[in-house]
UniProtKB/Swiss-Prot annotation:
Specifically expressed by M (microfold) cells which are atypical epithelial cells of the intestine. Residues 222-478 form the ZP domain. Residues 316-339 are annotated as: Flexible ZP-N/ZP-C linker. This is Pancreatic secretory granule membrane major glycoprotein GP2. The lineage of its organism: Eukaryota, Metazoa, Chordata, Craniata, Vertebrata. It is found in: Zymogen granule membrane; Secreted; Cell membrane; Apical cell membrane. PANTHER family: ENDOGLIN/TGF-BETA RECEPTOR TYPE III, PANCREATIC SECRETORY GRANULE MEMBRANE MAJOR GLYCOPROTEIN GP2. It comes from Mus musculus (Mouse). One of its GO terms (biological process) is establishment of localization in cell.
Length: 531
C-alpha cells in the first residue's frame, strides 16, 4: 500500500514506498498557508494538514514498460488499486499518460486508463484532470481524479501524477510509448522514427513527413529468374498522401493489384519476366537482356489519374536460360523428369548459332549449310541444381523424327563423345545444370535435306555418384547402349542447305536413302554402329 505518513510535525520528510522497480524521491514540506499552487498540501482534516511539499521533488518512480499502450498481452490483468500518491513514469514504455482513448486489453490490464485532457506545461502548477477507463464500448466507463504537474530537470521536462487508486479492478494507468526517451538501439532511415512498441525498439514511418518530389521515390529491385519485385518506400508514399492501401498498375492496365507490405516499411509489386507480358519492353544487346516497365500508383481501382509513375528495369546477363526466355520462337525441346524423393525437374534442349550459346535459332526449322557447326545446349531449369547435375548419356542423329529409328549416328555414346568424329566438341557434361556440345553438320547430315537430333538425359546425384564422365578407350568400344527413350529430348528438323539442294529429296527420307544416297555418309554411320 502506497502512503505518506507524517513523520515530524515541524519538518516532515514524506517517504513513499512501492514494490520494485521504483525510485523514491524525498522533499521537505512547507507550511500549509503557502499560496504557491506548485505545492501539494495535506487535507485540512488530516494530521499533515499543515505540511506542503513539491511533488516534483517528492514522488515515486514507476519504470514499467508493460504499461505501454502497445502492450496487448492480456494473459494477466493487473490492477492499480494500490497506487496512492505522486508518481513519475519513466522507461521504454513511455513517460506520459496517453491523452486519447486506449483500446481494451492493453497495458497489461482489462480496462486501460488514460488522461482526459492535455498535460500542463511549466508554470501551470498542479492541474486536476479526469482519468478514464475504457470498458464496455465506453471510453470513460470508470473515472478517477488525477492531479498532474509539469516539472523540469537538466535533461528536460517531465510530469508527475497524483493517483488515487482505481475505481475497480482490473484497471491500470497506461503510458504513451511515443513519449519514451529515444534510447533507440537500431538505426532508422531519415523518413522513420524510432519508437518502443511490443517491448522492442522499432522504426516506424514519421507522421509529420511531407514529400512533394516524386523523384525521391527510388525503387529497390529484386531481379528474379521468373519475376521482378519492385519495392517502394512506404514512408515516402505516406508523405505523398497515400494511405495504407495503394493500387499499382503496370504498362498493361490489366496487370494491377494492391501493393503488398514488406519488412522495414516497404511495399512491393511483382512483374513477370516475360517479353511483352504486362507491357514489358524487352531490349537485348550483346551481353544482356533488359526488361523495362512502369509502375503507376493510384489510391483505388476507379481513379485513373495516377499520382506517381515509377520507371524500372532489370538487366539479365545473357546465358542459355535467359536467351531462351527472351527469344520469341526458339527451337527448343522440353522434358519433365521425375526423380524419386527429389520431385520433378524440367530439362530443355535448344539449337544455338555460335559458341556463346546465347543466340538460339528461332522459327519452325533450322536451315544450315553442310559446313556449319551446330551448337546444342541442354539445361536443367527447375529443380535442385546444387545436388543434381545434368548428364547427357547418349546423343544421336536420325534420318527421321522417330527417336527409335534403328539408324543412328552417335555424337555422344555411353556418356562419351564419338572420338572418330574430330568435329565433336563436348564443352560441358555432368558438371553443372548445363550440358553443351558442338558438331559439324556434314558429318551426320548425309546427302539429305532433313535430320533430327535426340539426346538421352540423366540427372546425376552428386552426393552419391560420380557425375563427370571418365572416357577411356575401352569404354568407347563398349557395346551399343540401352537407351531409356522416356528420357530423350528431340529436336528438328534441321534442313541441310547446299548447291545441289534442288536435286535432293524433300521431306523425311527413308532409311535406305539416308544410308546410300551420299557415299561420304556411309562410312561414318557404319563406324558409329560399331563403336
Amino acid at each position: 500500500m502506497v502512503g505518506c505518513d507524517l513523520l515530524w510535525l515541524a519538518a516532515a520528510s514524506c517517504v513513499l514506498t512501492l514494490v520494485s522497480p521504483s525510485t523514491i524521491h524525498q522533499g521537505y514540506g512547507r507550511p500549509r498557508n503557502s499560496s504557491n499552487l506548485d505545492l501539494d498540501c495535506g487535507s485540512p482534516d488530516s494530521p499533515s494538514s499543515g505540511i506542503c511539499f513539491d511533488p516534483c521533488q517528492n514522488h515515486t518512480v514507476l519504470n514499467d514498460p508493460t504499461r505501454s499502450t502497445e502492450n496487448n498481452d492480456s494473459s494477466v490483468a493487473w490492477c492499480d488499486d494500490n497506487l496512492h500518491g505522486w508518481y513519475r513514469f519513466v522507461g521504454d514504455g513511455g513517460v506520459k499518460m496517453p491523452e486519447t482513448c486506449v483500446s481494451v486489453f492493453r497495458c497489461h490490464t482489462s480496462a486501460p486508463m488514460w488522461l482526459s485532457g492535455s498535460h500542463p506545461i511549466l508554470g501551470d502548477g498542479i492541474v486536476s484532470h479526469t482519468a478514464c477507463a475504457n470498458w464496455n464500448e465506453n471510453c470513460c466507463f470508470w473515472r478517477s481524479e488525477v492531479q498532474v504537474k509539469a516539472c523540469s530537470e537538466e535533461l528536460g521536462e517531465y510530469h508527475v501524477y497524483k493517483l488515487q487508486g482505481t475505481p475497480e479492478c482490473s484497471l491500470r494507468y497506461c503510458t504513451d510509448p511515443s513519449t519514451a526517451p529515444k534510447n533507440c538501439e537500431i538505426t532508422c532511415r531519415p523518413e522513420e522514427e524510432c519508437v518502443f512498441q511490443n517491448n522492442n525498439w522499432s522504426c516506424v514511418c514519421r507522421q509529420d513527413l511531407h514529400v512533394s518530389d516524386s523523384q525521391s521515390l527510388q525503387p529497390l529491385l529484386d531481379c528474379g529468374d521468373n519475376e521482378i519485385k519492385v519495392k517502394l518506400d512506404k514512408c515516402l508514399l505516406g508523405g505523398m498522401g497515400f494511405k495504407e492501401e495503394i493500387i499499382a498498375y503496370l504498362n498493361d492496365r490489366n496487370c494491377n493489384g494492391t501493393m503488398q507490405d514488406e519488412p522495414n516499411n516497404w511495399v512491393s509489386m511483382t512483374s513477370p519476366v516475360v517479353a511483352n507480358y504486362c507491357g514489358n519492353i524487352l531490349e537485348k544487346n550483346g551481353t544482356h537482356a533488359i526488361y523495362r516497365n512502369t509502375l503507376s500508383l493510384a489510391t483505388d481501382f476507379i481513379i485513373r489519374d495516377f499520382r506517381v509513375n515509377v520507371n524500372f528495369q532489370c538487366a539479365y546477363p545473357l546465358d542459355m536460360s535467359v536467351s531462351l526466355e527472351t527469344a520469341l520462337q526458339p527451337i527448343v525441346s522440353s522434358l519433365t523428369v521425375d526423380v524419386d524423393g527429389a520431385g520433378e525437374f524440367n530439362v530443355k534442349m535448344a539449337l544455338f548459332q555460335d559458341q556463346s550459346y546465347t543466340n538460339p535459332y528461332e522459327g519452325a526449322e533450322v536451315l544450315l549449310p553442310v559446313e556449319s557447326i551446330l551448337y546444342v545446349g541442354v539445361l536443367l531449369n527447375r529443380g535442385d541444381t546444387s545436388r543434381f547435375k545434368l548428364l547427357l548419356t547418349n546423343c544421336y542423329a536420325t534420318p527421321s523424327e522417330d527417336r527409335h529409328d534403328p539408324v543412328k549416328y552417335f555424337i555422344i555414346k555411353n556418356r562419351c563423345p564419338n572420338q572418330r568424329d574430330s568435329t565433336i566438341n563436348v564443352r560441358e557434361n555432368g558438371v553443372s545444370s548445363e550440358s553443351r556440345f558442338s558438331v559439324q553438320m556434314f558429318m551426320f547430315a548425309g546427302n539429305y535435306d532433313l535430320v533430327f537430333l535426340h539426346c538421352e538425359v540423366y540427372l546425376c546425384d552428386s552426393t552419391t555418384e560420380q557425375c563427370q564422365p571418365s572416357c577411356s578407350t575401352n569404354r568407347l568400344r563398349s557395346s551399343r547402349p540401352a537407351i531409356d527413350y522416356n528420357r530423350v529430348l528431340d529436336l528438328g528438323p534441321i534442313t541441310k542447305r547446299s548447291a545441289q539442294s534442288s536435286a535432293t529429296s524433300k521431306g523425311t527420307p527413308h532409311t535406305t536413302g539416308f544410308l546410300l544416297a551420299w557415299p561420304m555418309f556411309f562410312l561414318p554411320v557404319f563406324l558409329a554402329l560399331l563403336f
